[in-house]
């Protein structure tokens, strides 16, 4: 009996082990099967996101018609007057929560969902519709940007001058006492590429009131002005009120929201950025976003130190040391001194890979070459890296001098389009043709488009910048926004000679209230509604839209009723229009924001 019971135990144990083994193998196989499905579907989603703008909007008879989503009517209250310049992700009231190291408190710090405001931001008392372009470049209404501090503190530098109910912009600046046009003339003498269409895109760090960027527009150069939110100067708000491209931002601990090799030129006119501190990490970010062959221009300390040091409250020895340190850092990053005259110095980012190969071979080199695990285009809440981003070997024609000159480059498929899933020269050509037809139709349903009533425009979810390209002859500029969650097509936008930024529409955009005349979106809610609540996107749109400004929403019919209901609660007046192909599955909603004043103010 004992021997029989003992002999039966191994048999049961073996059976149980075999059963578990079979189950485990089956589970693994099923997991691989599900993983294959997931990866396949994920690729389809990415492909759909890119190719949605490269195919005609023709309804498929096989697609089931979903019942449009419905929501209850809602009426959003007014925010208090203290919110009139509210920037949710760069809110001075939240600065004390964050560290002062490298001024990181000035970076984006967005409130959690439970702290988001669900109210409408009022304009300042006495707000008027902005002066139209191009007069707006020279003057704006004081009540629209009521900042006296900058007028008083910078009066001797002629940044701006208050006269009656207007601010006037005489084109002065810290480093251009003879006017910005004279300053840019000197710069063009040093950089002939600014005259022939070679240089098209630029970034101005620490932009003042954006007079440099404003002057470049007449020279065929599109500059994006960059400055942090502050309590006094409101540099970006002044720039956008003037109709000059600008965005809130600071080089601190995170990368700027642009891809690598984006700008043809970067500029700093006494922008007070400590370029040689922290191992030159700020210069490394400039190196990342400037394309090979592009330029970095510096005017102000320590340039021309032997003549200027007395006015800088320093010693000539200190400034000489700073200059030598700056030159050494730039050389170690594969910049070469290009030209210098008086207060302006120019360095050029090398295109020759031998410099980067030399860094890679020298194990003791500082800064080192970034390894392959660091994605050069990753730029949404991505920490700054203390290393040199070398040009990608497979991309050989993205450098300045290799890409076509402006305006030819707008319609030539850049080499980096091959990095976008489904991207090709044919897809870009098709996209351009499609957007020409769409914009032609938009101008029928919104006659103000193409006139001086609209200056600052945002394409909230572009792919190749086709909407912007179709408007290139009109008196507007376009901020092209590429979702941080979609395929990385922003390098293509920059290679075409346009400007833009990465962004996640679950968060607030990096700008002041009342800064855009037109917001355009194409299928944004279809693509993002699973992540972002619709009402918060629309409230953010209302925040950045100017009173009397317009919205063009091109969206699936499934969302149209809900969008219309929310828009009514935001005090927009809207009308529904057919698309250019009059398909049932897609509609256009054209809205206008009303000019209203807080009940606590007088109009």
From Swiss-Prot:
Enzyme Commission numbers on file: 2.1.1.-
Gene Ontology process terms (BP): methylation
One Pfam family this sequence matches: Methyltransf_29
Keyword line: Glycoprotein, Golgi apparatus, Membrane, Methyltransferase, Signal-anchor, Transferase, Transmembrane, Transmembrane helix
Compartments in which it is found: Golgi apparatus membrane
Cytoplasmic side: 1-16
Glycosylation sites: 313, 600
SUPFAM superfamilies cross-referenced by the UniProt entry: S-adenosyl-L-methionine-dependent methyltransferases
Top class in the EC scheme: transferase
First and last residue of the signal peptide: none
InterPro entries the UniProt entry points to: Put_SAM_MeTrfase, SAM-dependent_MTases_sf
Sequence ranges on the Lumenal membrane side: 38-603
Topological category with respect to the lipid bilayer: Single-pass type II membrane protein
Transmembrane segments: 17-37
Molecular function as annotated in GO: methyltransferase activity
Cellular-component GO terms for this entry: endosome; Golgi apparatus; Golgi medial cisterna; Golgi membrane; trans-Golgi network
Principal location: Golgi
Family that this chain belongs to: Belongs to the methyltransferase superfamily.
Protein name from the UniProt record: Probable methyltransferase PMT20
Species whose genome carries this gene: Arabidopsis thaliana (Mouse-ear cress)
Taxonomic lineage: Eukaryota, Viridiplantae, Streptophyta, Embryophyta, Tracheophyta
């Amino acid at each position: 009996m004992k021997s029989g019971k003992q002999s039966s135990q191994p048999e049961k144990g073996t059976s149980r082990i075999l059963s578990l083994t079979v189950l485990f193998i089956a589970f693994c196989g099923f997991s691989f099967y599900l993983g294959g499905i997931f990866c396949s579907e994920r690729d389809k989603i990415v492909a759909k996101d890119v190719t949605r703008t490269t195919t005609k909007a023709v309804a498929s008879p096989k697609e089931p018609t979903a019942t449009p989503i419905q929501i209850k009517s809602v009426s959003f209250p007014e925010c208090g007057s203290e919110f009139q310049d509210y920037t949710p992700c760069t809110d001075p009231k939240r600065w004390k929560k964050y560290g002062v190291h490298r001024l990181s408190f000035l970076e984006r710090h967005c409130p959690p969902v439970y702290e988001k405001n669900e109210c409408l931001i009022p304009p300042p008392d006495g707000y008027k519709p902005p002066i139209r372009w191009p007069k707006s470049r020279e003057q704006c209404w004081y009540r629209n940007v009521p900042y006296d501090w900058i007028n008083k503190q910078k009066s001797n530098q002629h940044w701006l001058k208050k006269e009656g109910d207007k601010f006037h912009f005489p084109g002065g600046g810290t480093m251009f006492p003879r006017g910005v046009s004279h300053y840019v003339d000197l710069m063009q003498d040093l950089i002939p590429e600014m005259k022939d269409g070679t240089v098209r895109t630029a970034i101005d760090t620490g932009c003042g009131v954006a007079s440099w960027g404003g002057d470049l527009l007449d020279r065929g150069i599109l500059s994006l002005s960059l400055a942090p939110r502050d309590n006094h100067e409101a540099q970006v708000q002044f720039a956008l009120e003037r109709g000059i491209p600008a965005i809130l931002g600071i080089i601190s601990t995170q990368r700027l929201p642009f891809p690598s090799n984006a700008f043809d030129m970067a500029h700093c006119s006494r922008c007070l950025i400590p370029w040689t501190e922290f191992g030159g990490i700020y210069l490394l970010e400039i190196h990342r976003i400037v394309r090979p062959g592009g330029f970095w221009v510096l005017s102000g300390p320590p340039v021309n130190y032997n003549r200027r040091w007395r006015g800088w409250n320093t010693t000539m020895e200190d400034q000489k040391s700073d200059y030598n340190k700056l030159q050494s850092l730039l050389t170690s990053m594969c910049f070469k001194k290009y030209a210098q005259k008086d207060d302006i110095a120019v360095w050029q980012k090398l295109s020759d890979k031998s410099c980067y190969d030399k860094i890679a071979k020298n194990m003791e080199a500082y800064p080192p070459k970034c390894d392959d695990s660091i994605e050069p285009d990753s730029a949404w809440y991505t920490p700054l890296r203390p290393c040199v981003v070398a040009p990608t070997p497979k991309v050989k024609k993205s450098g300045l001098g290799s890409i076509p000159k402006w305006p030819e480059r707008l319609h030539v498929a850049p080499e980096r389009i091959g990095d976008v899933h489904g991207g090709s020269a044919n897809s870009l050509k098709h996209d351009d043709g499609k957007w020409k037809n769409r914009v032609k139709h938009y101008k029928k349903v919104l006659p103000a488009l193409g006139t001086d009533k609209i200056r600052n425009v945002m394409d909230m979810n572009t792919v190749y910048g086709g909407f912007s390209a179709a408007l290139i002859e009109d008196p507007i500029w376009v901020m092209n926004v590429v979702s941080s969650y979609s395929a990385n097509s922003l390098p293509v936008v920059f290679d075409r000679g346009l400007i833009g930024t990465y962004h996640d529409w679950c968060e607030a955009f990096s700008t002041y209230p009342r800064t855009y005349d037109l917001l355009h979106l194409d299928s944004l809610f279809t693509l993002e509604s699973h992540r972002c609540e619709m009402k918060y996107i629309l409230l953010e749109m209302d925040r950045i839209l100017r009173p009397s400004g317009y919205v063009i929403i091109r969206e699936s019919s499934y969302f149209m009723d809900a969008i219309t209901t929310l828009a009514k609660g935001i005090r927009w007046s809207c009308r529904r229009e057919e698309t250019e192909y009059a398909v049932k599955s897609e509609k256009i909603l054209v809205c206008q924001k009303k000019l209203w004043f807080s009940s606590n103010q007088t109009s």
